A protein has these predicted regions:
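C-terminal and inter-domain tail/linker signature
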Residues: 1-149
């Protein structure tokens, strides 16, 4: 009897290509190209869930502060707005770029990798960890992003 699995099997090479395309999105200056990349990478009902740095979470946890410590974008429009905002602030204004670290891994339908936000002089400004949960069609269903340093 053959057992059917609900998750997509992807090769290490295609996992690396997915992570590379994902990071390229956050560095992309053209808004139309970002929109097309989002449609290629995410399902239409996909989610991008971001845990911001500890400093932001501490502020959000204070009494009387109407912020959430977890930021979530659902669907192409919200993910596009998130990508545009990130590009305008971190890449456009701050001059940073996003690059992957050499630690990509996959397990079933999950791809895991670290990334860095790097200044033009090579200084690492921030480090993040992503878990991409893939749908059966290979596109991102849920994207969990942790800013770890």
């Amino acid at each position: 009897m053959t057992e059917t699995h609900a998750f997509v099997e992807i090769s290490s090479r295609s996992a690396a290509e997915l992570a590379e395309k994902y990071l390229t999105l956050w560095n992309e200056p053209d808004a139309d190209r970002r929109r097309r990349m989002i449609a290629e990478l995410w399902r239409e009902d996909g989610r991008h869930i971001l845990q911001p740095p500890q400093e932001m979470r501490a502020i959000a946890a204070q009494p009387g502060i109407a912020l959430t410590a977890i930021l979530e974008a659902r669907g192409y429009e919200e993910i596009g707005a998130r990508a545009t905002s990130a590009y305008e602030h971190w890449v456009g204004s701050e001059g940073l770029s996003f690059r992957g670290r050499d630690d990509l891994d996959r397990l079933g339908d999950v791809v895991k990798f670290h990334w860095e936000a790097v200044a033009k002089d090579g200084e690492v400004f921030a480090v993040g960890l992503n878990f991409l949960v893939l749908a059966a069609d290979g596109r991102i269903e849920r994207d969990y992003t942790f800013v770890v340093a």
